[in-house]
From Swiss-Prot:
Region (Disordered): 607-628
Name of the featured protein: WD repeat-containing protein 48
The encoding gene: WDR48
Keywords assigned by UniProt, alphabetized: Acetylation, Cytoplasm, DNA damage, DNA repair, DNA-binding, Endosome, Lysosome, Nucleus, Phosphoprotein, Repeat, Ubl conjugation pathway, WD repeat
GO molecular function, one term: deubiquitinase activator activity
Record note on quaternary structure: Interacts with USP46. Interacts with USP1. Interacts with USP12. Component of the USP12-WDR20-WDR48 deubiquitinating complex. Component of the USP12-DMWD-WDR48 deubiquitinating complex. Interacts with PHLPP1. Interacts with RAD51AP1; the interaction is direct and promotes formation of a trimeric complex with RAD51 via RAD51AP1. Interacts with ATAD5; the interaction regulates USP1-mediated PCNA deubiquitination. Interacts with RAD51; the interaction is enhanced under replication stress.
Alphabetical GO biological process terms: DNA damage response; double-strand break repair via homologous recombination; positive regulation of double-strand break repair via homologous recombination
Sites of Phosphotyrosine modification: 28
UniProt function note: Regulator of deubiquitinating complexes, which acts as a strong activator of USP1, USP12 and USP46. Enhances the USP1-mediated deubiquitination of FANCD2; USP1 being almost inactive by itself. Activates deubiquitination by increasing the catalytic turnover without increasing the affinity of deubiquitinating enzymes for the substrate. Also activates deubiquitinating activity of complexes containing USP12. Docks at the distal end of the USP12 fingers domain and induces a cascade of structural changes leading to the activation of the enzyme.
Length: 677
């Protein structure tokens, strides 16, 4: 009954289908890295990617390949991560509106929390209490007991959460002290709001920043807070005095990331200006430029294996993550070669990172070709690639070639309606199918490069074929299953089921392709790999999630209707023929011009009445076929079809004529005339 109710709910909301074209193993961060967590016990670094993937890396420098594993379940940017339970559990927050709980050692997702209604931007962790807070653009803060979260199972899946309300704007930063007695949020409201998480009581509001508050830190006992803002300043606040006690103007632009040593005496800051400084909180004039990154700094993570910290890991809007050594920082400071005037250029402590976790390229530009099947892309390394949307794969790497030239080179005078949309947000190609236009594009099998067993050239619906391929492994889509009795006999005899038809009969997509069912507007309902839809749990969730418009084509095999195009057919002015009564004709938008020419020849010009009479009295099929072939040949020899006074190619279809030649509102008008001999 519950499943039935949920199916109804899915029916009421508008559900889209998306899939990602990618390699099975995406080893490298394909986009900027939003968050970092270091596990010193296992020498592992966790990176949270804008490509939706959390990756685990070894920070042992003797390892040639630092990649360990990927943690994949999110469908949009992962904005923040925290390691809990001495590194056993990882909590992640994403723009897909979910918070996920992971087994950090084994790398699998244990549960998903769906309380947020918009992007989840920040997490905070109280180590002594195993308490995590999440916050985001929905202005809500939720508190989670980590021990409760890790105990969740398929049957015990109810979790209670406390919430902190009162934020008036989107939250971008969050901090909680280790004892779990104070929580602070920063937002586009430009103020810091402070609560007691034990009672959910609002304690205070701190004013001073003039722009979004992007980074927050609290000391252990929750008496002092550091904030970094897009206004370019770092502020130190006394929560006891409820005021700002120091302002540090270290950066030329917005401050987006902060770290502080355990003693809360030195702050490490980075942001839009790409520079990373260490500032002595007790003597603000003393600040050391540690390094300069190649892109704006998004997050930093101190290596706390010793005191003072020996190194700092830095993530930026680029996909590479760097480790910078802090070894000489005290000598550097003692020498007096520090920055006491941030307008003067100074030499950074480090010019080269000590360790580099190499990133991959991100797709930044794409062009959908006229056939509405292939896409050209350009990435951050200026490499151009050619992709097949229908088969969900890369066809060819073209290298560093001119993008516009490649587009021109592949232009074809053919029009196919739009039937999908493309998103590059994760740095990979995400294709989305929507009920409103998914079935708009029909092509002939021959034009699509597919052959039929019977040699015919059927019309194929691109969106329909793709949906059938994406759900090929879902048993509910399989055709002609044996009845249970036969199935049992077969099972006993060990025979394979050969009668079941899967997929679309023309092509398959790579089995590792991620398929995402989500609400229009972003909330993900279900993500799975194409090959996993045969699993019992996945199959059950698909029953609850797949919308009716997808069921119609994949399960019920109801093909959508052909698109019709209305048009008028008139003699050309140069023919001297009398204008016909203006009858509005209608045909499939894929009808070729040659078929209209045949219609003109046979029904209007009617050049050879005798031949027609003879043929019509002959009912034998060979005669009919000859007649058809004769008319086709004669029509092309004797008839010309024009649109806007341009002679049409017989191979062109009506939708292409309308799009490229008619180019105006109202119904398409075609003119015919006899060729001059």
């Amino acid at each position: 009954m519950a499943a039935h109710h949920r199916q109804n709910t899915a029916g009421r909301r508008k559900v889209q289908v998306s899939y990602v074209i990618r390699d099975e193993v995406e080893k490298y961060n394909r986009n900027g890295v939003n968050a970092l967590q270091l596990d010193p016990a296992l020498n592992r670094l966790f990176t949270a990617g804008r490509d939706s993937i959390i990756r685990i890396w070894s920070v042992n420098q003797h390892k040639q390949d630092p990649y360990i594993a990927s943690m994949e379940h999110h469908t949009d940017w992962v904005n923040d991560i925290v390691l809990c339970c001495n590194g056993k559990t990882l909590i992640s927050a994403s723009s897909d509106t979910t918070v996920k709980v992971w087994n950090a050692h084994k790398g699998f997702c244990m549960s998903t929390l769906r309380t947020h209604k918009d992007y989840v931007k920040a997490l905070a962790y109280a180590k002594d209490k195993e308490l995590v807070a999440s916050a985001g653009l929905d202005r809500q803060i939720f508190l989670w007991d980590v021990n409760t979260l890790t105990a969740l199972t398929a049957s015990n899946n109810t979790v209670t959460t406390s919430s902190l309300s009162g934020n008036k704007d989107s939250i971008y930063s969050l901090a909680m002290n280790q004892l779990g007695t104070i929580i602070v949020s920063g937002s586009t409201e430009k103020v810091l709001r402070v609560w007691d998480p034990r009672t959910c009581a609002k304690l205070m509001k701190l004013k001073g920043h003039t722009d979004n508050v992007k980074a927050l830190l609290l000391n252990r006992d929750g008496t002092q807070c550091l904030s970094g803002s897009s206004d370019g300043t770092i502020r130190l606040w006394s929560l006891g005095q409820q005021r700002c006690i120091a302002t540090y103007r270290v950066h030329d632009e917005g401050v987006w990331a902060l770290q502080v040593n355990d003693a809360f005496t030195h702050v490490y800051s980075g942001g839009r200006d790409r520079k990373i400084y260490c500032t002595d909180l007790r003597n603000p004039d003393i600040r050391v430029l540690i390094c300069e990154e190649k892109a704006p700094v998004l997050k930093m993570e101190l290596d706390r294996s010793a005191d003072p910290p020996p190194a700092i890991w830095v993530a930026t809007t680029k996909s590479t993550v760097n480790k910078w050594i802090l070894k000489g920082i005290h000598n550097f400071r003692a020498s007096g070669d520090y920055d006491n005037d941030c307008t003067n250029p100074i030499t950074p402590l480090c010019t080269q990172p000590d360790q580099v976790i190499k990133g991959g390229a991100s797709i930044i530009q794409c062009h959908i070709l006229n056939d509405k099947r292939h896409i050209l892309t350009k990435d951050t390394n200026n490499n151009v690639a050619y992709w097949d949307v229908l088969k969900a794969c890369k066809v060819e790497d073209l290298g560093k070639v001119d993008f516009e030239d490649e587009i021109k080179k592949r232009f074809k005078m053919v029009y196919v309606p739009n039937w999908f949309s493309v998103d590059l947000k994760t740095g990979m190609l995400t294709i989305t199918l929507d009920e409103s236009d998914c079935f708009a594009a029909w092509v002939s099998a021959k034009d699509a490069g597919f052959s039929s067993p019977d040699g015919s050239d059927p019309k194929l619906n691109l969106g329909g074929l793709l949906l059938q391929a994406l759900l090929e492994y879902w048993p509910r889509t399989h055709v002609n299953p044996m009845d249970e009795e036969e199935n049992e006999v077969n099972h006993v005899n060990g025979e394979q089921e050969n009668r079941v038809q899967k997929g679309n009969g023309y092509f398959q997509v790579p089995p590792h392709t991620p398929v995402i069912f989500g609400e229009a507007g972003g909330r993900t309902l279900f993500r799975l790999l194409c090959r996993d839809s045969g699993g019992e749990t996945e199959s059950m969730l698909l029953n609850e999630t797949v919308p009716q418009w997808v069921i119609d084509i994949t399960v019920d095999k109801n093909m959508p209707k052909f698109n019709k195009i209305p048009f008028y057919l008139q003699p050309h002015a140069s023919s001297g023929a009398k204008t016909l009564k203006k009858d509005r004709l209608s045909a499939s938008d894929m009808l070729q011009v040659r078929k209209v020419m045949e219609h003109v020849y046979e029904k209007i010009i009617n050049l050879d009445n005798e031949s027609q009479t003879t043929s019509s009295s002959n009912n034998e099929k060979p005669g009919e076929q000859e007649k058809e072939e004769d008319i086709a040949v004669l029509a092309e020899e004797k008839i010309e079809l024009l649109c806007q006074d341009q002679v049409l190619d017989p191979n062109m279809d009506l939708r292409t004529v309308k799009h490229f030649i008619w180019k105006s509102g109202g119904d398409l008008t075609l003119h015919y005339r006899q060729k001059s001999t």
